[in-house]
Amino acid sequence: GKPTRQNCTFCHANAGGGDNVKHGDIAMALLDTTREFDVHMGTDGGNMECVDCHQVMRNVDGQLVDHGIGGMPYHSVDDGEMLGCIDCHGNVASIHVGTPVQTITELHPTLACQVCHIPAFARDTSTKTEWYWEDAGQDIDPIPVDPDTGRPTYDKKKGTFVWENDVRPTLLYFDGKWDRMMINKNDQYTELPVVLAKPTADYTTPGAMIYPFKKMIGNQPADAGNETMLVPHLFGTKGGPNPYWGKFDWGLALQDGADYTGQTYTGAFEFVDTVMYLTVNHEIAPKAQALGMDGACGDCHTGDQIDWIALGWSGDPVPNGTRP
């Protein structure tokens, strides 16, 4: 039979080392939840399986050719064979005719569906929004716990974290293309924070739409001599004799990593600030919770909810924001 939500979620929800750590919108809670949390996967809603949208490629004999989701080694997958909102729901303009948000959709033709229909993510299980590797290696007892989420904010192996629930997504223009930092290809940096992954588009890009993203900030090791992002050897012996989680020596772990990846390591390291963005497509809320419902412009405007500069504006365009 076809894979179930449990098959897919076991790996994808635990990416990053724990439940909902990485993505923010894919948690184990999706296995058995309500439409209040996710209208598509709620057992009292669509009760859909992941493969209903994330499809695969098969040959003429029906044999599996490809998982259907490209970009597997990277931070965020390509669309592959994935269905989009309009494949099931129809044209954005026509579906909102006669609804309380018709005017809003007519005024905002570059808003992707997810912007309004995912007002927040990590609405059930908290997600990491900050991660500081520089703090790793300390013997701290007792381990501090975030009072709001009940999750530890420190791990000797991984450093210090910030956990959040009900995170308002960061909005950026997106046309499906990314700038990604990749080892031995474009792994050097010239300014801080180091942008590990970000959509390439801006408001001038033809066909680009505004989409929601999870913004992840933190710090991680880099070569102080040649300003190159490094890959530390964390565990096991395949990557060398000095895993960080075994000896807690960054210098040795980074040398192991460089030997394995073929990077040049000068022997001097530092921790640099980093930022990356990940797509947000799950946790679609019931339509009554959508941003702008009943003409509620204040859901986005006249406050600090939106980073208008990231969208190419000098500020909120409603009062006085302008573009070049």
Annotate each predicted stretch with a short phrase.
Residues 1-324:
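C-type cytochrome heme-c attachment and multiheme electron-transfer modules
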